Amino acid sequence: MTDTTASGTARVRTRFAPSPTGFIHLGNIRSALYPWAFARAMGGDFILRIEDTDQQRSSQAALDVILESMQWLGMEPDEGPFHQMQRMERYRAVLAQLQAAGHAYPCYMSVAELDALREKQLAAKEKPRYDGSWRPEPGKTLPPVPAGMSPVLRFRNPQGGVVAWDDKVKGRIEIRNDELDDLVLARPDGTPTYNFCVVVDDIDMAITHVIRGDDHVNNTPRQINIFHALGKEPPVYAHLPTVLNEQGEKLSKRHGAKPVTQYRDEGYLPDAMINYLARLGWSHGDDEIFSRAQFLQWFNLDHLGRSAAQFDEAKLRWINAQHLKAMADDALAALVAAQLQRRGVAQQELANGLANGRLARICALFKDRCDTTVALANWAQVFYADVTPAETERALHVTEAIAPALDALADALSGCEWNRPAIAAAFKQVLASQGLKMPQLAMPTRVLTVGTAHTPSVDALLELMGREKVLARLRNR
């Protein structure tokens, strides 16, 4: 029996190995989160490896998005990115090593022959597999080598015994070697295949723990056998359950998954994303909201879940709102300023707002009403740009009957000190003189100054807006 063991006291080294063939979504990035967190928790190293041997589908644009997504989330690697396409010489050397040791052999079976074999096996209700026609055996006569044909190189898989490993998520898994055929290590043009490259990379990069999606479980016994053929012990494996979308399908580009960078653009916070993704397959008791530092302190492989996790955008927004509320106002102000600058607000005006704390106070006033930084920037924008109230709210609150009171309020505000107590006193004065209640005057004031009747305290609102803007918006109605 072939078995794997933990890597003893070796320094923990994990990896994330994406293919740059499209945008990276939340299911992909979760496969980076756990190895990154485990390396950080154990004081180890996190390696980024780019599996780009599929040159027809790989692109620099896709790679840039992977790097951008990881940088935004603060999951930058200790080493890499390493590119498989830059390691071809090393792969060729190891292929030659395997062939010289009798662990690999050339196979000249054509595609047509393989197709015919597959059809025959399916007709006989057998599992389709390579039949070993070109596998050298003592006393066996191999078919004649076809003229002008380049062979594939196949791995000589053990024919007896069991390959087994203790998966940190799924428990013990055992596969009989006679269920595995001789997989292709290199194509006719000499290009090495995925399962071979992965093993060579994991050996050369001294990977101790492979934490990846459970769609790789079927690859694992084949990879373990290649490790042993090369005289190396395989790493510890942890195969993560699938992430499902809100309809219960596997989260994928085909089924509506969004790029990670889109969540950034929609106003999600990196630490909130880390929090949410961590809970999408791992738990620490009943803790739902935690910081990045807490996650890295608590994380281990023992609490990874075995069941598929389902993405829930409403839960993500709720978690984001909790992180937004807990975030320091000046840090939020910097994020909001960047968004407002992209919307055309003058850089100097924003710089002044950051320097004098005004933008931080705006964020403090509105952040409890927001679940994204985009929503918060929408509120902040009314302090820097012209406002057009919704016609329904204007018609409801800014009536001819209230016009005298609005004029009186503008007059009172033009001569008072500009702070919350003085603004509140001006309102009381006008309410008393006009015989009104606070909502009758506060609602139209809110509509005219920020475009909606539903805001925090009106005196706090007006103080932050500044006398000049407030008077202009009250009078130019």
UniProtKB/Swiss-Prot annotation:
Disordered: annotated span: 128-151
GO MF annotation terms: ATP binding; glutamate-tRNA ligase activity; tRNA binding; zinc ion binding
UniProt catalytic activity: tRNA(Glu) + L-glutamate + ATP = L-glutamyl-tRNA(Glu) + AMP + diphosphate
Compartments in which it is found: Cytoplasm
Positions annotated to bind ATP: K253
Keyword match Protein biosynthesis: yes
First-level EC class: ligase
UniProt KW Secreted keyword: no
Motif 'KMSKS' region mapped to chain: 250-254
InterPro entries: aa-tRNA-synth_I_cd-bd, aa-tRNA-synth_I_codon-bd_sub2, aa-tRNA-synth_I_CS, aa_tRNA-synth_I_cd-bd_sf, Glu-tRNA-ligase_bac/mito, Glu/Gln-tRNA-synth, Glu/Gln-tRNA-synth_Ib_cat-dom, GluQ/Sye
Gene3D superfamilies named in the record: 1.10.10.350, HUPs
GO biological process, one term: glutamyl-tRNA aminoacylation
Keywords from the named record: Aminoacyl-tRNA synthetase, ATP-binding, Cytoplasm, Ligase, Nucleotide-binding, Protein biosynthesis
Enzyme nomenclature, EC number: 6.1.1.17
Annotated GO CC locations: cytosol
Biased composition (Basic and acidic residues): 128-138
Domain of life: Bacteria
Principal subcellular localization: cytoplasm
Function, in words: Catalyzes the attachment of glutamate to tRNA(Glu) in a two-step reaction: glutamate is first activated by ATP to form Glu-AMP and then transferred to the acceptor end of tRNA(Glu).
HAMAP family for the chain: Glu_tRNA_synth_type1
Family stated for the protein in its record: Belongs to the class-I aminoacyl-tRNA synthetase family. Glutamate--tRNA ligase type 1 subfamily.
Quaternary assembly: Monomer.
Protein name: Glutamate--tRNA ligase
